[in-house]
């Protein structure tokens, strides 16, 4: 069962397990142009079935959260404040799971708060997106222009969406539902993640971390995911044949199962061992 809450104006979806297996909650953070709906379709109910209490928030000005009229004034720091506010509301340290821009927000949140773990899915690297934009510019300049057109909602083209975000087959109904829920992103936040607000590695908490990427990702290439992993001195897993939208690709269960297996080993296992 998934419930929807408004926590001081922030939309939060809450999936409760029928048979809890872990005391550590999961908090999912969406990427740019999206909302908590990114996780509600598949990941929240799936993880609840696995016994995890799973939450997803819509950052301010996204989804059903407040301040939509102030969208373009919102900063990465504002988004981090939202994540920390929901952690306080939970009353305990969660595992933070962020996709794309949400992964960058998770890294920034770890500068200010401890978490039981962190999962970065096709995440913007700690150095920000400037290098990624140059990489895309030189390797796929037409793709960069098409992607910018799509994500600014100036051309609602399902075929362009499929090419930009998906690598596996996706039916037209699912694609159109995804497209209709996309929204503009804060210009200020995009500037922040591009230039001004790199993750502070010296102050960043280092909980157990899982770094995931997609072989066919046209936004956050495997090279950038590998760069993030190198920065943290960790391995990464690149899912073959998948695109940027790991949450909605046909093979999304592969991603969910990888996260669950990691949780069992690195988070749940450490809790059990600590109490033994």
Show where each model-derived region lies.
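Conserved acidic catalytic loop of the alpha/beta-hydrolase fold
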Residues: 78-94
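Conserved alpha/beta-hydrolase
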Residues: 46-68
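Flexible "cap/lid" loop of the alpha/beta hydrolase fold
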Residues: 115-149, 189-193
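Short beta-strand/loop motif that positions the catalytic acidic residue
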Residues: 205, 211-213
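The serine-hydrolase catalytic nucleophile loop
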Residues: 32-44, 223
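Conserved loop-alpha-helix segment in the C-terminal half of the alpha/beta-hydrolase fold
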Residues: 213-242
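Active-site glycine-rich loops that stabilize anionic/oxyanionic intermediates
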Residues: 31-35, 100, 215
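Catalytic active-site module of serine/aspartate enzymes centered on a nucleophile-bearing elbow/loop
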Residues: 237-276
